[in-house]
Amino acid sequence: MTDFRQDFLKFSLAQNVLKFGEFTTKAGRRSPYFFNAGLFNDGLSTLQLAKFYAQSIIESGIRFDMLFGPAYKGIILAAATAMMLAEKGVNVPFAYNRKEAKDHGEGGVLVGAPLKGRVLIIDDVISAGTSVRESIKLIEAEGATPAGVAIALDRMEKGTGELSAVQEVEKQYGLPVAPIASLNDLFILLQNNPEFGQFLEPVRAYRRQYGVE
């Protein structure tokens, strides 16, 4: 059986979502790689991305009753992943939020199925954790329970303290976070594919400086 995490990273490279080189992160760090999930922006790539999410979610073992996608990136992720989960025999409802509340029609900030039971949040990455915190507030305000967070990539790097943004979410809320792939998987990709050999040492150095266990 192939490693879907490695397949996901190779797919991300093919879509130019994952790039190697010299980049500056929002935190001002010089990074040897860059991941931009916004470039999964056509039908086929979104379909394949949703398949990876569905597989990752199922293999995580997280128990959930529905999906929630925080605006804006999470909206399409929740809808597409719900369809792929349904193909795998897991048919669950999904919902998302608006950035601005509507005062007409159905109104409010929530769209889709009512938030009930155990709600799995789905997003592209966890950077500062702001989107997750806002999602948790929305879910709990509706009387539902956050079940965990599914993301595309865990960069596994320190935030302002010693913990990564993912670890901070896990610690603060006691929620499991299920990434399709992580920095460790990226490191394995570089080790096993000589054509990317020139980036192995820069990624190793970056992990040494900013990485978490």
Curated annotation (Swiss-Prot):
<dbReference type="GO" id="GO:0004588">
    <property type="term" value="F:orotate phosphoribosyltransferase activity"/>
</dbReference>
<dbReference type="InterPro" id="IPR023031">
    <property type="entry name" value="OPRT"/>
</dbReference>
<feature type="binding site" description="in other chain">
    <location>
        <position position="26"/>
    </location>
    <ligand>
        <name>5-phospho-alpha-D-ribose 1-diphosphate</name>
    </ligand>
</feature>
<keyword id="KW-0808">Transferase</keyword>
<dbReference type="InterPro" id="IPR000836">
    <property type="entry name" value="PRibTrfase_dom"/>
</dbReference>
<feature type="binding site">
    <location>
        <position position="104"/>
    </location>
    <ligand>
        <name>5-phospho-alpha-D-ribose 1-diphosphate</name>
    </ligand>
</feature>
<dbReference type="GO" id="GO:0006221">
    <property type="term" value="P:pyrimidine nucleotide biosynthetic process"/>
</dbReference>
<dbReference type="InterPro" id="IPR029057">
    <property type="entry name" value="PRTase-like"/>
</dbReference>
<protein>
    <recommendedName>
        <fullName>Orotate phosphoribosyltransferase</fullName>
        <ecNumber>2.4.2.10</ecNumber>
    </recommendedName>
</protein>
<feature type="binding site" description="in other chain">
    <location>
        <begin position="72"/>
        <end position="73"/>
    </location>
    <ligand>
        <name>5-phospho-alpha-D-ribose 1-diphosphate</name>
    </ligand>
</feature>
<feature type="binding site">
    <location>
        <position position="127"/>
    </location>
    <ligand>
        <name>orotate</name>
    </ligand>
</feature>
<dbReference type="Pfam" id="PF00156">
    <property type="entry name" value="Pribosyltran"/>
</dbReference>
<dbReference type="GO" id="GO:0046132">
    <property type="term" value="P:pyrimidine ribonucleoside biosynthetic process"/>
</dbReference>
<comment type="similarity">
    <text>Belongs to the purine/pyrimidine phosphoribosyltransferase family. PyrE subfamily.</text>
</comment>
<comment type="pathway">
    <text>Pyrimidine metabolism; UMP biosynthesis via de novo pathway; UMP from orotate: step 1/2.</text>
</comment>
<comment type="function">
    <text>Catalyzes the transfer of a ribosyl phosphate group from 5-phosphoribose 1-diphosphate to orotate, leading to the formation of orotidine monophosphate (OMP).</text>
</comment>
<dbReference type="InterPro" id="IPR004467">
    <property type="entry name" value="Or_phspho_trans_dom"/>
</dbReference>
<dbReference type="GO" id="GO:0005737">
    <property type="term" value="C:cytoplasm"/>
</dbReference>
<keyword id="KW-0328">Glycosyltransferase</keyword>
<keyword id="KW-0460">Magnesium</keyword>
<feature type="binding site" description="in other chain">
    <location>
        <begin position="123"/>
        <end position="131"/>
    </location>
    <ligand>
        <name>5-phospho-alpha-D-ribose 1-diphosphate</name>
    </ligand>
</feature>
<dbReference type="GO" id="GO:0044205">
    <property type="term" value="P:'de novo' UMP biosynthetic process"/>
</dbReference>
<feature type="binding site">
    <location>
        <position position="102"/>
    </location>
    <ligand>
        <name>5-phospho-alpha-D-ribose 1-diphosphate</name>
    </ligand>
</feature>
<keyword id="KW-0665">Pyrimidine biosynthesis</keyword>
<feature type="binding site">
    <location>
        <position position="98"/>
    </location>
    <ligand>
        <name>5-phospho-alpha-D-ribose 1-diphosphate</name>
    </ligand>
</feature>
<feature type="binding site">
    <location>
        <position position="155"/>
    </location>
    <ligand>
        <name>orotate</name>
    </ligand>
</feature>
<feature type="binding site" description="in other chain">
    <location>
        <position position="99"/>
    </location>
    <ligand>
        <name>5-phospho-alpha-D-ribose 1-diphosphate</name>
    </ligand>
</feature>
<comment type="subunit">
    <text>Homodimer.</text>
</comment>
<dbReference type="GO" id="GO:0000287">
    <property type="term" value="F:magnesium ion binding"/>
</dbReference>
<feature type="binding site">
    <location>
        <begin position="34"/>
        <end position="35"/>
    </location>
    <ligand>
        <name>orotate</name>
    </ligand>
</feature>
<dbReference type="GO" id="GO:0006207">
    <property type="term" value="P:'de novo' pyrimidine nucleobase biosynthetic process"/>
</dbReference>
